[in-house]
Every structure is written in C-alpha cells, then in structure tokens.
Amino acid sequence: MLAKLERLIGEIGDLNSKLILLVGPSRSGKTQLLRQLGAKLNIEPLNVGLELGRRLAATPNNKRGFSAGELLREIALLEQFGERTEAPLLLDNFELLFEPSLQINPLDLVRRLAHSKRVVAVWPGELRGDRLVYADMSHPEHRDYSRDGVVVLEI
C-alpha cells in the first residue's frame, strides 16, 4: 500500500489539486500508512487538531471560523519551512475543522492547501459511492462532498 501511495504522489504533480485522501473504516490503518510515508520521507505528519486547536483556543469565539483557514495555512507553512519544497504535506486528525461553530468547508480548506503543494491527508469519514461523507446524517457535524478533484486511496 505504501508503494501505491508513493506512486500516486509522483503522479499528482501536474493536477490542479494535488490532494490525496486516505479513506477507509476506523482502525483500517490510514494513520499508520501516513506515518510510514512520513518515516520514509523523513517528514512528521501534522496533527491538525492538536496544532489548530492550540491556536484557536487563543482566538475569540466570534473570530474562530474566519481565522481557522488562515491559521491552517500558517501551520502548513511552518510545517514545510526548511523542508524540501517537493516533499508533501502530511495531514492527520483534522476532525476539528468539522466543528459546526466554525462554519467552514473542511474539504475546501484542505483542497486549497493542495493547489501549490502535494498534500496527503487522512479523511476522517468514509467513501460512499462517489461521495466523501463525514458523520451520520443526524449528527450536527455531518458533511457530504463529491470526490471530484480529489485522488482517493481506499485503505
């Protein structure tokens, strides 16, 4: 599976969105695969929930939604600072982005990061047909997106 992921990373360089989502059931090995890739490339995967949560905690409630995207871009820039520019950005644990009070589109935010840099991210939901789904329909954090413009690697 690691070899397949590495091949995909090499193939997405010319795409408009250079985003690969690792998708699979809970405990299927998505995070483990991301860590294996990180170890091979000597890159530490970014724990988005931890890093972004720290910064949002210092942001007033009424500005968090507006700030979340900018803070994520800042964190991503800091993460790649000093790294080889061709190295992909590895993202994990970005469930915080689905918080309804932020009123943001998590997939769009991650897609925007992937316009200029390859991004490999663990999708915290599942793939249903051609739809990326996060949480059940009855859950306040429920989201349903088309997988258009995203390379999906099913685990």
Residue ranges: model-predicted function:
Residues M1-G13:
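N-terminal pre-Walker A segment at the start of P-loop NTPase domains
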Residues G29:
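Conserved glycine(s) of the Walker
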Residues D14-L22:
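Pre-Walker A (Motif I) flank of P-loop NTPase domains
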Residues P25-S26:
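P-loop (Walker A) phosphate-binding loop of NTP-binding proteins
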Residues G38-L46:
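Post-Walker A helix-loop "phosphate-sensing" segment adjacent to the P-loop in P-loop NTPases
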Residues L50-Q80:
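Short glycine-rich substrate-engagement loop in P-loop NTPases that contacts/grips substrate
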Residues L33, L37:
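Hydrophobic positions on the alpha1 helix immediately C-terminal to the Walker A/P-loop
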